Amino acid sequence: MARRRRHRGPRRPRPPGPTGAVPTAQSQVTSTPNSEPAVRSAPAAAPPPPPAGGPPPSCSLLLRQWLHVPESASDDDDDDDWPDSPPPEPAPEARPTAAAPRPRPPPPGVGPGGGADPSHPPSRPFRLPPRLALRLRVTAEHLARLRLRRAGGEGAPEPPATPATPATPATPATPARVRFSPHVRVRHLVVWASAARLARRGSWARERADRARFRRRVAEAEAVIGPCLGPEARARALARGAGPANSV
């Protein structure tokens, strides 16, 4: 037979202890009937009064240690108390908001006054590669000739007259003869494959093919007409023409 469980009502709330009740050596434990033991402690000591201008009394001890309490103005060190102290620094002047432009250093080779700097050697002038310089010179000469041709020669600047060099009597009047060197140098030229291919397929190749085709056709015609031009063929033709059928 199962034992019936005794029903208990809701638990009564625990009575709050007195404010500031902290168990100390002078605390006493008392118990009352139908109640839990209560702790009766001695009245807590009053906290020390906060310093003037300090944190409020509601702050905890840990928070009081980290709070900064400003001191009075009389506690500050005054410069007048120190005879050897330097004079106070003047207040900084108001600076403009926009930064002043920095002076740029002169380029290398230029002195402070704008002239050439004797201590710095002059830089080497820029020179074009030989191929580009030659192309530029040829182009300039070609454009000058075109300009003179279009202008018709009017107003064109005359070329400067070159002073004639007097012929020295030591110079022989006969022209110099060409002398061939006994040493021959062979230099291999490099050509493009496309240029060589075009040279092989040029006009001379076409003419050679035409000549070969003409010889072949002449040989074929000679093989057909050749037997008719021989002496035997001529005699047969004359005998056939002298017959009675052909007589008038």
Swiss-Prot record:
Segments for region (Required for nucleolar localization): 1-16
Residues covered by region (Interaction with host PPP1CA): 175-188
Main location: host cell
Compositionally biased intervals (Low complexity): 164-174
Residue positions of motif Nuclear export signal: 128-137
Annotated region described as Binding to PP1CA, given as residue ranges: 175-188
Sequence repeats: 161-163, 164-166, 167-169, 170-172, 173-175
Segments of this protein annotated with the region Interaction with host EIF2S1/EIF-2ALPHA: 218-233
Renumbered ranges of motif Bipartite nuclear localization signal: 200-218
Sequence segments annotated as region (Important for interferon resistance): 190-248
Function summary: Inhibits the establishment of the immune response and of the integrated stress response (ISR) in the infected cell. Plays essential roles in viral nuclear egress to mediate capsid transit across the nuclear membrane. Facilitates nuclear egress cooperatively with host C1QBP and protein kinase C/PKC to induce lamin A/C phosphorylation and subsequent reorganization. In turn, lamina disassembles and nuclear egress occurs.
Family: Belongs to the PPP1R15 family.
Leftover remarks: ICP34.5 is detected as early as 3 hpi prior to viral replication but reaches maximal levels late in infection. ICP34.5 gene is therefore classified as gamma-1 or leaky late gene. The phosphatase activity of the ICP34.5-PP1 complex toward EIF2S1 is specifically inhibited by Salubrinal, which inhibits viral replication.
Name this polypeptide is given: Neurovirulence factor ICP34.5
Organism expressing this protein natively: Human herpesvirus 1 (strain 17) (HHV-1)
Organismal lineage: Viruses, Duplodnaviria, Heunggongvirae, Peploviricota, Herviviricetes
